[in-house]
Amino acid sequence: MKFLKENKSTIEPIIYTSGIPAYTNMLIDLIDPKREIFEHRLYQNACYLFEKRDEDIFYMIKDITRFKNVRDMNRSILIDPNPLNFILSPENGLPFVGYNAELHTSGSDKDEYLIGMTDIIKEVGEQKDVRGYLKENYNIRQYLKNAKLM
């Protein structure tokens, strides 16, 4: 949170979740009750539904390109632990390891993975077009092709 507060003039963090508003707001309000950091929140209804009934597959996919009229895709990053969310905008994807409470059982354990990503986020943010940097360093499109997801 400290990093986001300190860089508010250059970073606009937006919560984009496949969760429902009631649940999401309850959690985010605990860490940002005045909406000083996360001014915008996008929920399930902002996701695309991918469904294959014959195979019992149901997934909500986040697509930041649907906001290209109000956000510059050259400057937009989707940070997500699930590679499926990069299918519709692979050049904007920055993967990370999701938090798993089951792995952090004692009170002293902290999830500091995102804190460790601050240098990466700063470096990406310094790029005129984040997509070239992300492609060169993460190449999500090739990963998705290799996994036969594209």
Give a label for each model feature.
Residues 22-150:
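C-terminal cap/substrate-recognition subdomain and adjoining C-terminal extension
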Residues 2-29:
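Substrate-recognition element of Asp-dependent hydrolases with the DxDx(T/V) motif
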